């Protein structure tokens, strides 16, 4: 096979990949029960990753590959956990290589689907659909899946990967609203609640990372107690005004007596998209917190640090910023309180991850008919979306090498297709450098006034890079023949 030599950035089609494909770093050998399934999983990643947001038939391009993908997702020997197993291992390696505290962000999201037979998938909620002729509210159930995910990020906001993932549906709605009015939810055993998944993900994340002291998790008292048992840390936004001291006070009354110790300026985005700075008055206090009354025989009181940050001036066009955070980390100074506020501000990263799933992969547009098949496809989407998010954030961090996520042929393609600036130093060719080139393929202009590239231009660039690589591969075969 001939090698073009006419340009300093000519693409060498014989360059070996390092790794062979990016996905090889996210798939463990033998993680599926059959080598053929391992090969098919890699092929599914290549196909879906090269056509993010497209349907399975369009990504697979022909009936044979489409049918093979359908069979893979229908295979009883394949599970969503098996698909994610290699990614969990890779996440652990990235966490080990990173320095400083690791934030484990947890959140739940919904995926809704329109199906002729919704019972094959399940339901997420019951909603009002207007009134009938007699004026009574009509209810209908929404077909879909729920996903609770845990994402490891550095304190600079770089996503290192998923540490735990749970997918499920709901099957009981009738009478639940009336039941909530009759019982005290704090007296119900946590094991019977959906919120138990927060504890399950906390435990799985700590087992995976194997260094719980570095982890900070994102207002369940059982989570507080489990964190103490596992020797890990948490930082959450408090939702409940818990009993404090001997039960004669609450957390709110304890904080009310504290003076403001610092001011912190943050940026707030309006509904219309405009960003403006606001000043928060910050105070903190370490408080002896009691468990809920119905669970005081099961759980012990805890010494927790509360941080209250409230917007100094009452706005007229939006709700006032009012954060009340609770953590088992020590908070003795104003600087430590502000540090925890900056950590909590990173919580939106997991919301961005879920947005990539729905907007980039268009996870709610897929046509698979059963929950079992959908969960496996969503597991694939999660890894693809993490990669987009990882490259996007790496474009703002100049420490990672390009070979960490891009293959040799991909690097050469970017060098050939996206010209360098004359002043570009040779030693600056890291992942951040090539991420900008990748974003340019997706339409990013890289002007001085432009913000850093976002996820949309990044996945467009990845799709285009895949098409260019395919064209080069076909051209090389034609020349060779």
Language-model features and meaning:
Residues 2-132, 141-146, 151-481:
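Single, function-defining residue in the core of a domain
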